[in-house]
């Protein structure tokens, strides 16, 4: 390809012309040394070479660290003229490789940015480890504390149950008057109440049920049983004394009747 373009170049001087001796004899042209033709031939080849290979863009040599691996410059040098020859002068500049980092400080900046981004992960993990607090676990029955709070336990206000909550509690009490801990937790979760509220409601409901059915209280029953036992002991002792007194009176009356009979017999 280079030889064909060299032969077809317009600047190339065709050597087919009359001998110089004829022109020199007629004084048409001055005599030239053979170096003239070789100089013209060389200048034409250089001009073609400049057009074929555009001037290389200014490239500054950069210093690299030992850690970085330099790219082979020989391949880059051979690749640029070939691309320029195929694409032309206008597109030769776009084939340059992308600029490399100017200073080795950029990796440290990237590492610092990574270090700044890493502290966000412990916060997310800490937020994920926080326990989930459901509404029924909160102390909603505690009233607000006054400004004159002396450190004692605040006074609890009376819980106002809704109609839906009372209905569900009554239904549960109809089937079971005593709840297990698991069932109490389930009811508290479903009704958005605390376990303490469920426990107190069932205690009050059981007392009301015993009162309606006229059943003695368990605590009152124990005290009454002790009173009854003591009363029975006193009554038994009184009975023994009464029986002894009656026997004594009966024996005394029999003695009197016997003496009276003896006196009557002697009179006769």
From Swiss-Prot:
Residue ranges the UniProt entry marks as DNA-binding: 154-213
Compositional bias ranges of the Polar residues kind: 115-128
UniProt short sequence motif Antp-type hexapeptide, positions renumbered to this chain: 133-138
Region (Disordered): 70-129, 212-268
InterPro entries, per database record: Antp_homeobox_Deformed_sf (IPR050609), HD (IPR001356), HD_metazoa (IPR020479), Homeobox_antennapedia (IPR017995), Homeobox_Antennapedia_CS (IPR001827), Homeobox_CS (IPR017970), Homeodomain-like_sf (IPR009057)
GO cellular component term, pick one: nucleoplasm
Chain intervals with Low complexity compositional bias: 77-95, 105-114, 222-253
Biased segments, Basic and acidic residues type: 258-268
Domain of life: Eukaryota
Subcellular location, record wording: Nucleus
Matches recorded under PROSITE patterns: ANTENNAPEDIA, HOMEOBOX_1, HOMEOBOX_2
Molecular function terms, GO-annotated: DNA-binding transcription factor activity, RNA polymerase II-specific; RNA polymerase II cis-regulatory region sequence-specific DNA binding
Single Gene Ontology BP annotation: positive regulation of transcription by RNA polymerase II
Chief subcellular location: nucleus
Keyword Transcription on entry: yes
UniProt keyword terms in alphabetical order: Developmental protein, DNA-binding, Homeobox, Nucleus, Transcription, Transcription regulation
Family classification: Belongs to the Antp homeobox family. Deformed subfamily.
Purpose of the protein: Sequence-specific transcription factor which is part of a developmental regulatory system that provides cells with specific positional identities on the anterior-posterior axis.
Protein name per the record: Homeobox protein Hox-C4a
Organism for this UniProt entry: Danio rerio
Lineage per the UniProt record: Eukaryota, Metazoa, Chordata, Craniata, Vertebrata
